């Protein structure tokens, strides 16, 4: 009887371990697949169109792999924190430090001695795959920033702060000849911020920062 109970206990623990291991493997593979798709099929082909940024990325042979690994680990670790309904403030600091650095590089290092003005809010509605991909990335880039605002700000504060930030970025790109001041960029970036803000509001109701 004792032996049977001990054996049952062992198999239960073994079953729990195998289940957790399978979850780790499946979520890890899913995070890698999603990261690979975003970086390899969307981000890199679009960003390498800019010669200056392409040269910057080419200086390090493993730029693409590094970005895929970073995004994969970020998503993978986030899943486990979400499942525990707790998120580490250290995780947030590390992820956002890298994110803000990468955002700066993408926004201010992709072009040199170039500026133009576009007042058409829908200039991305064209039959050009690269422009459509870039429009998608303009939304995607700013989702984490919107989530960052969502940690503390109220809706009115978020609207003001996010618009000022985005318009400021567009103005700096134009003034310093490193990009275009485009109404469409402002709208797409702000859409990304809005998505990130509401995602964060939802997550705040489900998780606790520790």
Predicted regions and their residues:
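N-terminal secretory/membrane targeting signals
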Residues: 1-2, 29
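N-terminal amphipathic/hydrophobic targeting modules at extreme N-termini
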Residues: 2-9
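Bulky hydrophobic segments
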Residues: 14-178, 183, 198-210
